[in-house]
């Protein structure tokens, strides 16, 4: 189903464009229906294999994209959230989960194998672009979301509050690999771009978020308060590696760009945040209060290494720039914060293990050409925008 909005100025409803552009591939496709009422959709020579043994509501979409969608469409709140997720044009492969999955959605573009989880997963979503294998978790995962390598370039649309929060999370341009967690994860989100393996946690992770290599390029959009908080977190353009924590993590966030392995903690981590290599390029946007708080944290250009503590750390912070290894403490540390190396290249940010709480690892975020371009900033805009700026 190809929906290419070539005619500008179309007035559309709220729910009309949420799913109308998901499948839009152009090539040879192979569709293999699953067993036990399993729908599978594949484009571009991509084998979409449905799950087996009692799966329900499994949706497999491969090779969807927006082609020549002219700006100027009047859209609602929820219209642009998912309309730009996949846009690849190559061979894809998607394999559905097995054994009792529910609500599984796998979207893969550009030769990307998106493999669904196995054994009782619910609400699993895997999206991968540009040769990226997105592998879902196994054994009872719930709410797993994998978004890889989607982005918008020069859109210029006037959008609402929630429209731009997730539409630009992935914007990488390379081979990616995303591996979901295993054994009872909930709310797991893994995003990887540019050949970046984003490994999800295992054994009962909750709220795991992995964002890698997303960015906006010359958008020029007028955005609200919450629109730019997350749209510029990842913006790297290289090979990345992200490894999620294992064994009962909650609220784990790992973001890695430019060959930077950001290793999440293991064994019951909470609120772990790892951000690597996010940046904006010549945006020139009018921003609100909270938009610029995190967009300029790191801006350096060297190799860095950060190693989180192990065994029950809380609030771990380690700051290291220019090849400096900042080793976190072990066994029950509190209030430790780790910001490493702005615009990192080959930087290794390793999260703590065994019961860490509130671990924050930020590696390699930076802005390029966003200074002195007429941005209107508020009270909290410049609090952290100049922390790391080594070049």
From Swiss-Prot:
Induction trigger: Specifically induced by cold temperatures.
Region (6 X 23 AA approximate repeats): 9-391
Keyword terms, alphabetized: Repeat
GO biological process: cold acclimation; response to abscisic acid; response to water deprivation
Region annotation (11 X 14 AA approximate repeats) ranges: 49-363
Extent of Basic and acidic residues compositional bias: 21-33, 70-92, 155-176, 219-240, 283-304, 373-391
Chain segments carrying region Disordered: 21-391
Highest taxon in the source lineage: Eukaryota
Composition skew (Gly residues), residue ranges: 361-372
Coiled-coil ranges from the UniProt annotation: none
Sequence repeats: 9-31, 49-62, 72-94, 95-108, 115-128, 135-148, 156-178, 179-192, 199-212, 220-242, 243-256, 263-276, 284-306, 307-320, 327-340, 350-363, 374-391
Biased composition (Low complexity): 34-59, 93-145, 177-196, 241-260, 272-282, 305-324, 333-351
Pfam families attached to this UniProt entry: Dehydrin (PF00257)
Signal peptide start-end: none
The family this protein is said to belong to: Belongs to the plant dehydrin family.
Comment text on domains: Contains 6 A-type repeats and 11 B-type repeats similar to those found in maize, rice and barley dehydrin and rab proteins.
Record function comment: May reduce intracellular freezing damage during winter by hydrogen-bonding to the lattice of the nascent ice crystals, thus modifying the structure and/or propagation of ice crystals.
Protein name stated in the entry: Cold-shock protein CS120
């Amino acid at each position: 189903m190809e929906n290419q909005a070539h005619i500008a100025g179309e007035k559309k409803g709220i729910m009309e464009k949420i799913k109308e552009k998901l499948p839009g591939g152009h090539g040879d496709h192979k569709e293999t229906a699953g067993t036990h009422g399993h729908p599978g959709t594949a484009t571009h020579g991509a084998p979409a294999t449905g799950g087996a043994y009692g799966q329900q509501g499994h949706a497999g979409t491969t090779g969807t994209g927006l082609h020549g969608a002219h700006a100027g469409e009047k859209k609602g709140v929820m219209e642009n959230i998912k309309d730009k997720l996949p846009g690849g044009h190559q061979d894809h492969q998607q394999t559905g989960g097995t054994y009792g999955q529910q609500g599984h959605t796998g979207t893969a573009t550009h030769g990307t194998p998106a493999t669904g989880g196995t054994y009782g997963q619910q609400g699993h979503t895997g999206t991968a672009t540009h040769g990226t294998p997105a592998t879902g978790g196994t054994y009872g995962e719930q709410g797993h979301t994998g978004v890889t390598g989607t982005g918008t370039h020069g859109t210029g649309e006037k959008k609402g509050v929630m429209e731009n929060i997730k539409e630009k999370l992935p914007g990488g341009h390379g081979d990616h690999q995303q591996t979901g967690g295993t054994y009872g994860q909930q709310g797991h989100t893994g995003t990887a771009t540019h050949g970046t393996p984003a490994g999800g946690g295992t054994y009962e992770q909750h709220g795991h978020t992995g964002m890698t290599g997303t960015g906006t390029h010359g958008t020029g959009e007028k955005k609200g308060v919450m629109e730019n908080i997350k749209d510029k977190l990842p913006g790297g353009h290289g090979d990345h590696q992200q490894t999620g924590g294992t064994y009962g993590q909650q609220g784990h966030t790992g973001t890695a760009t430019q060959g930077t392995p950001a290793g999440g903690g293991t064994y019951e981590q909470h609120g772990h945040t790892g951000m690597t290599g996010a940046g904006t390029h010549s945006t020139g946007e009018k921003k609100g209060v909270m938009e610029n708080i995190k967009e300029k944290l790191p801006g350096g250009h060297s190799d860095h290494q950060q190693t989180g503590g192990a065994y029950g750390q809380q609030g771990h912070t380690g700051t290291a720039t220019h090849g400096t290894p900042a080793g976190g403490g072990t066994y029950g540390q509190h209030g430790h914060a780790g910001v490493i190396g702005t615009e990192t290249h080959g930087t290794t940010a390793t999260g703590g293990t065994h019961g860490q709480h509130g671990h924050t690892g930020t590696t390699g975020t930076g802005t390029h050409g966003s200074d002195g371009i007429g941005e209107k900033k508020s009270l909290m805009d410049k609090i952290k925008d100049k922390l790391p700026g080594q070049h």
